[in-house]
Amino acid sequence: MKWHKFHTLGHTMSLFRLLALSFVLLMAEGDAYSQLRKGSKREPLINEWGIGYGAGSPFGATEWRSVKNSEFTQKFSQMWQLNIGHQFTSKDYGAAPKGYYYPTLGMFFQWLDYSHLKIRGVEPIFPKRKTADFGQIATFGITLHQYCWTSGKWRGYLNHETGAAYVFNPVYEVPSWVTLSKPWQIFVGFGWFFAYEIKGGEIAFGPQFTHLSNSGLANYNTGINNFSLSLRYRHKSIREIQKCKPEEALIEKDGRKFKSHFYGSVMAGYGKVYFEDPNSAVQITIMADAMYKIDPNNGIGVGFDYYHNDNPDRTDRQDYIGAGIKYDRWFGPFVIHVQVGSYLNGKRPIKYKGTARIYENVGYKYVMFRHKPISPYIGFYTKGNGFEAEQMSFALGCTFH
C-alpha cells in the first residue's frame, strides 16, 4: 500500500487591519495519508491533538480530531475538524468596546495541496528528521459564537426595537455576559508552513492570510482581511499504516501549466462599499490587472491594476490605479490571488492628485478552462485601503495567459 505524509498549518483568522494588534491564535492543521494501492480497502486513521499560539490573531483554541482519508486525487486531500476556543477584541471596533470575550465553536474544511512535495515513505512511528517540509493550504469554514464576556469597563445590551446590535453606555460595570446579534463568521484563507518532525509529533510554523465575511461585531460585520504567524505542536498516533519503499512514495511537482510568464484579467460585476458608508448603493465595478510571474504556474510576481467604480453616492472614489506585488496559487480550476502595494485615487473627472495609499486586493476565482490561453471565470474579490476591506464584489471576467 502506498501512502503519503504531508503537513498543514492552519488557523482561523487574524486582523491585518492594524499590525500592532496582538492576539491569541487558533491553528488548525491536519495530516493525510492517501493514494492506496488498487484493490486495497484499508485506510489509515490518524488521531491527533495539539495546542498552538500565534501573534496577530483574535482567535485561540485547542482541538481534537480524527481524520480518515480516502483517495481524493493525487494532489489533494480533505479534512473536517471541530474547534472549541475563544475570541476577544483588543481594540474598540465600532460599538464593540475593548476587552470583550467570545466563546466560539467552529467547523473547518481544509483543501490540502502537497503536489509540490517529494513525499517520502517513512515509518509509522515518526523518526527524527533534521529537514523541514514546506507546504501550502487553502482553508474555509465557519465559527459560531453567541455570547460575549464584558471586561467590566462598559455596559451593553441588545436593542431589538431599533435593530442595533448593541447600545453601549460609558458606565463602569462588573464583568457580565451579553448576546451577539451576528454569532457567526465565514472565512476563506491560504498560507504556508514549515513542519519539523519530532518523535511522536510535529512542530510547525508559518504565516496565514484570511478573509472574514462577518466579524460578528456590531458596526464591524463586513469583510476583514487578516494575517497571522503561527506556531504549533501536534501529537500524532497512527493505525493501520503499511510501509512502502521510499522510492515508491515519491511524487514530483507537476510541470508548468502555462507557456507564458504573463497573466492578466479583465472583469465587470456588482459590488458594495463598506466601512465609510455601510449603506451606500450597490455599484458597478470594472477592473483590469496584469502580472508578470517568476513561475508561470504559481508564485510571486509584480503587476498593476485599474478599477473604475460607478456609484453616484461616492463621487470621490471613482477611479484607482495601483501597482504592487502579486501572488497566485492554483487549486485545480480555482485560483487565489493577493496583491499588496500602493495606489492613487482620483475624483470625477479623473485627476490623480491624492497621495499614494497602501492597499490590498484579495480574489477567489473559478476559471472555466485553466489551461487555455483565454478563459472566462466567475469570482469574488475584496479591495482594501490600509488593510481595511472597503469593497467586496462578485464578478464575471476573462483571464489571459
Spans of features found by a protein language model:
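Solvent-exposed loop/turn segments connecting transmembrane beta-strands
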Residues: 134, 152, 216-221, 274-282, ...
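Outer-envelope beta-barrel architecture signal
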Residues: 43-49, 99-105, 152-158, 199-203, ...
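Glycine- and aromatic-enriched membrane insertion/assembly motifs of diderm outer-membrane
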Residues: 46-50, 71-121, 278-335
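Transmembrane beta-strands of outer-membrane beta-barrel pores
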Residues: 53-59, 109-115, 162-170, 198, ...
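Residues on the lipid-exposed face of transmembrane beta-strands in outer-membrane beta-barrel proteins
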Residues: 82-90, 140-148, 160-164, 188-196, ...
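Short glycine/proline- and aromatic-enriched beta-strand/turn motifs that initiate or cap beta-hairpins
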Residues: 35-89, 234-236, 244-291, 399-401
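Residues that define the transmembrane beta-barrel architecture of outer-membrane proteins
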Residues: 45, 74-82, 101, 132-140, ...
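Outer-membrane beta-barrel "beta-signal"
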Residues: 225-246, 389-401
